[in-house]
């Protein structure tokens, strides 16, 4: 009998012999593997599994017609090994890259000879070890095993895969696994939702709102009762997705059953409310949970409230937050000072910002590149892009080196004002200083060239990004899909979308809205409708923006009936029809010379409490001019002023056109 097939020797681990040196045919030898302390000698088994032909046979989707007799004898010699020994061996093999192939071969060996049950528990243990170490994507692992290992997959296995996918920051894979659980009528556990939310929260970009709503709907459908940690993750996720109303509802639900979310979730919600300008609600939440409660506010909580005051340009209240922090013994950090500096910059108080920088240094908080990037962003938003050079000089005078974030803001500043030469100079400078561009850098640069009409250069930059160590993200693909759509390069659009999915990226609401917009503007209405249907099939809810893009596309071509059908579909999906959509519908009727229907939309607005804006009245005047009802144009203009709507340049131009035609007709 070959040495590799000898039965295991039942010896204490310190007397365990090593397998003969020549017993393997693979580079992954058992002597190079750390074997766990055990009453059993696994060396012969590992030597056998290290053979490439054996490993290929075990992991093949098609089982062999017959199993060699020596393998049967080897398996029989391990029939008395208890389950916990197999688990210990598997964990140890999974701990090293060198022994990982043996772990892959061991599982089907155990399955083939029925040596350990349940096998899914072993596979779940291996998945957990790999996800903790981050050395292998879980879906790749699943594909490496024959379907017979778990066919159909068990809930334990799917939940383990879901957790591993989340740990690997692959929410798309995790969502697919959640769908598989539902397809097989398995009940996901709370941990599955927590892992999935963690993967969404651990990304740089905010979670996609449609995905969160889908996830919450699935959780409610399963009738699982969230615990405090899961409520906290849900509140944090919706807050980061800029959906404070949904986060507030979740907070109320948690409190109704006596649960208190973690302080970081409350802080995230305060920050979201402040960002939305809802400072009164942010203040109330801060008082309820921190000042009136048992939890003492920390720096991050104060910063969240401070962000709201900066958002509404309430400098007095912002300065009071700093005073209160001092009175409560809470030390301000760099983010605190950067928010105040940002407030001063946005108010045009550059000298006050410089004084605060000095105070910051006096308090032992050295300003970083981030603080200066906030100053630069403030000037950018006020249109003072030329001050970018002054900020850079001040930064260098303070001994602070620009980092990636600062360069990203600088590139964005130049890009917004079509100073593409300066943007490329900043890009090249950061590379010269050894700072590698990240996905934000590339996205900003590519988008700036797209908007500046430099489409060829944008495509070149995208290719450079592909070749770099920074793979394109969802936002990158959205930018390129929009660029190719504007050029009506439809094969390129489809290829870009396919490539995006192949990279494991999930098309988000912006992706679908972009597709609907570019297809609609080019008259490819079938493709636009198909995108909406595909989105619904993926469990995502079309946004009002998407419907508006399609209504507007129909309106531009005077296809009023099609536009009206889209509005009806929008209402059927439970979405509120906005002024923007109704204005586009008026335009569609106007282009189709259907003035009566155009004015019926105006009546619909009034009956439903929607206030017509200047675009509404301007579009109606344009419709009247198109059907040569010039005498009614001044009447609509007068009605606009009476309603309190201030006319703009286009409205006045429409009035002049109407009066000009009236005068011409009278002369004639």
Curated annotation (Swiss-Prot):
Query: Member of which family?
Result: Belongs to the PPR family. P subfamily.
- Listed name of the protein: Pentatricopeptide repeat-containing protein CRP1, chloroplastic
| Membrane spanning stretches | none
* Gene Ontology biological process terms, A to Z: chloroplast mRNA processing; chloroplast organization; mRNA processing; positive regulation of translation
Q: Name one GO cellular component term.
A: chloroplast nucleoid
Q: Which domain of life is it from?
A: Eukaryota
Q: Which UniProt keywords apply?
A: Chloroplast, mRNA processing, Plastid, Repeat, RNA-binding, Transit peptide, Translation regulation
Gene3D superfamilies the record matches: Tetratricopeptide repeat domain (1.25.40.10)
The record ties this protein, via NCBIfam families, to: PPR
Q: Which gene encodes it?
A: CRP1
Q: What happens when the gene is disrupted?
A: Pale green leaf phenotype. Seedling lethality.
Transit peptide, residue positions per record: 1-64
**The keyword Transport is annotated on this UniProt entry:** no
Entry's InterPro entries? Answer: Pentatricopeptide_rpt, PROP1-like_PPR_dom, TPR-like_helical_dom_sf
Biological role stated in the UniProt entry: Required for the translation of the chloroplast petA and petD mRNAs. Required for the processing of the petD mRNA from a polycistronic precursor. Binds with high affinity to the 5'-UTR of the chloroplastic petA transcript. Activates psaC and petA translation by binding their 5'-UTRs.
Q: Name one GO molecular function term.
A: mRNA binding
Principal subcellular localisation of the protein = plastid
């Amino acid at each position: 009998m070959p040495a590799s097939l000898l039965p295991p020797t039942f010896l204490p681990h310190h007397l365990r012999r090593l397998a003969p040196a020549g017993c393997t045919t693979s580079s992954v030898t058992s002597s190079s593997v750390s074997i766990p302390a055990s009453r059993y000698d696994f060396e012969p088994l590992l030597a056998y599994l290290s053979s490439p032909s054996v490993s290929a046979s075990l992991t093949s989707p098609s089982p062999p017609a017959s199993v060699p007799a020596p393998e049967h004898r080897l398996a029989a010699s391990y029939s008395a090994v208890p389950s916990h020994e197999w688990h210990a061996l598997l964990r140890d093999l999974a701990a090293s890259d060198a022994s990982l192939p043996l772990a892959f071969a061991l599982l089907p060996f155990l399955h083939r000879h029925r040596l350990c049950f349940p096998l899914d528990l072993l596979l779940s243990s291996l998945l957990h070890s790999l996800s903790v170490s981050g050395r292998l994507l879980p879906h790749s692992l699943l594909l490496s095993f024959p379907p017979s290992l778990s066919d159909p997959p068990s809930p334990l296995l799917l939940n383990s895969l879901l957790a591993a996918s989340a740990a690997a920051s692959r929410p798309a894979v995790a969502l697919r696994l959640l769908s598989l659980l539902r397809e097989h009528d398995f009940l996901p556990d709370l941990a599955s939702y927590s892992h999935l939310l963690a993967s969404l929260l651990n990304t740089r970009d905010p979670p996609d709102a449609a995905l969160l709503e889908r996830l919450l709907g699935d959780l409610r459908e399963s009738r699982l009762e969230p615990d405090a940690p899961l409520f906290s993750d849900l509140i944090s996720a919706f807050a980061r997705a800029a959906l404070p109303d949904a986060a507030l509802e979740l907070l109320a639900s948690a409190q109704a059953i006596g649960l208190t979310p973690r302080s970081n979730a409350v802080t995230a919600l305060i920050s979201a409310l402040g960002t939305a300008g809802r400072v009164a609600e942010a203040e109330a939440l801060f008082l309820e949970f921190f000042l009136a409660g048992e939890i003492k506010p920390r720096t991050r909580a104060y910063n969240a409230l401070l962000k709201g005051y900066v958002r509404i340009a309430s400098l007095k209240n912002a300065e009071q937050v700093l005073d209160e922090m001092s009175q409560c013994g809470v030390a301000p950090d760099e983010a605190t000072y950067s928010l105040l500096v940002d407030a001063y910059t946005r108010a045009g108080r550059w000298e006050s910002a410089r004084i605060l920088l000095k105070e910051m240094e006096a308090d032992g908080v050295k300003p970083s590149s981030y603080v200066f990037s906030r100053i630069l962003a403030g000037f950018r938003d006020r249109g003072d892009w030329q001050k970018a050079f002054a900020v850079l000089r001040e930064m260098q005078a303070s001994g602070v080196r620009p980092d990636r974030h600062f360069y990203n803001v600088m590139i964005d500043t130049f890009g917004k004002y079509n100073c593409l030469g300066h943007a490329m100079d900043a890009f090249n400078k950061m590379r010269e200083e050894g700072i590698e561009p990240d996905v934000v850098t590339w996205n900003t640069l590519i988008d700036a060239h797209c908007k500046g009409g430099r489409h060829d250069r944008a495509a070149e930059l995208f290719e450079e990004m592909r070749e770099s160590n920074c793979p394109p993200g969802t936002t990158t693909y959205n930018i390129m899909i929009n660029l190719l759509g504007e050029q009506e390069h439809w094969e390129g659009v489809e290829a870009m979308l396919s490539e995006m999915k192949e990279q494991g990226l999930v098309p988000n609401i912006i992706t679908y809205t972009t597709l609907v917009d570019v297809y609609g503007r080019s008259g490819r209405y079938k493709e636009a409708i198909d995108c909406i249907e595909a989105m619904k099939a993926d469990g995502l809810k079309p946004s009002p923006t998407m419907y508006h893009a399609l209504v507007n596309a129909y309106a531009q071509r005077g296809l009023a009936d099609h536009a009206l059908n889209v509005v009806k579909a929008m209402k059927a999906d439970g979405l509120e029809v906005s002024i923007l959509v109704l204005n586009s519908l008026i335009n569609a009727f106007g282009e189709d010379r259907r003035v009566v229907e155009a004015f019926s939309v105006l009546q619909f607005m009034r009956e439903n409490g929607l206030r017509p804006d200047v675009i509404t009245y301007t579009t109606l005047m344009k419709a009247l001019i198109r059907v040569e009802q010039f005498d009614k144009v001044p009447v609509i203009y007068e009605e606009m002023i009476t309603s309190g709507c201030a006319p703009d340049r286009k409205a006045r131009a429409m009035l002049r056109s109407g009066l000009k035609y009236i005068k011409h007709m009278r002369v004639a």
